[in-house]
Structure formats: structure tokens, C-alpha cells
């Protein structure tokens, strides 16, 4: 075998690398597989519509709670709509909503889409105060021109000041 190193020391080193490499590859693969359940991507309703995450895949859905969309059922279920400028998604949640949850406020729902396109949330996070919004939500809303925080005012085309 002419491609093997001639020195016994170099051959041992090559054999050691050849033995360790598959073990490290398997360890890395198992680590990534184990973490796959805890990885959750953030989407706004319009991004979720474009990306169409697989039903059952855990994601974070963020946007504003649409006015007039909150429906509380006697069995503890809550239905509401999370919206951005271009799209909206119906959300179902079983449990107690955060105290600061209300219409027109930023929210992040953690859960998955069902086969019928309804988002089933396992957790719902709301804003802390009037100035706070989760970084992902504020970034996405700023990109769409819908969020006006930090003293900004809406810019309307054709305004004469």
C-alpha cells in the first residue's frame, strides 16, 4: 500500500485519526438530533404564509393581536388572531393568558400549525410594558413598516405638514 505513510509513527497517527473521526461525527449527529426538538424558528404571519412550516413543527409566531379577535370559551380555550401588515393567523390556546395580553399589543405564540392551518399555541408571551416588544417582533414589524416605537410616528404618503 504505497499511499500509507512509511513511518510507523505517522501510520499510528493516521489510524488514530481514522478511528476518532467517525466517533466525533456520530457524537455531533446525535447532539444535533437531540437538539432538534428545542430549536424553534420565529415567523410573522406573512412569513409563515410564505414559508409554510410543516404541520406539527414547533415555531414561534409573532405579531399584533387583532382588534376584536379574542374569543374566550367556557372550557378555558382562547381563540385570537395574530396579524401583521400582510397576513393573519388564527391561534388556539388552552390555558391562562398573560396579564398583559390584550388586543392591539405585541405577542409571541409558541406552538405549531395544525393540518387545517390553525396555529395551536402551547405558550403565549405578551409585552412587558408599553415600551417593550420582543426583538424578533419589533424587527419584523419595522421591516413591514407597521411598528412605530421609540417616538416614531407613522409616515403616510402625501402628508403635508
From Swiss-Prot:
SUPFAM superfamilies: Heme chaperone CcmE (SSF82093). Heme binds at residues 128, 132. Residues 35-161 are periplasmic. The keyword Ribonucleoprotein does not apply. Pfam families: CcmE. The keyword Transcription regulation does not apply. It is found in: Cell inner membrane. Keywords: Cell inner membrane, Cell membrane, Cytochrome c-type biogenesis, Heme, Iron, Membrane, Metal-binding, Signal-anchor, Transmembrane, Transmembrane helix. Residues 1-13 are cytoplasmic. It comes from the Bacteria. The chain crosses the membrane at residues 14-34. It is a single-pass type II membrane protein. One of its GO terms (cellular component) is plasma membrane. GO terms for biological process: cytochrome complex assembly. Heme chaperone required for the biogenesis of c-type cytochromes. Transiently binds heme delivered by CcmC and transfers the heme to apo-cytochromes in a process facilitated by CcmF and CcmH. HAMAP family: CcmE (MF_01959). Belongs to the CcmE/CycJ family. This is Cytochrome c-type biogenesis protein CcmE. The lineage of its organism: Bacteria, Pseudomonadati, Pseudomonadota, Alphaproteobacteria, Caulobacterales.
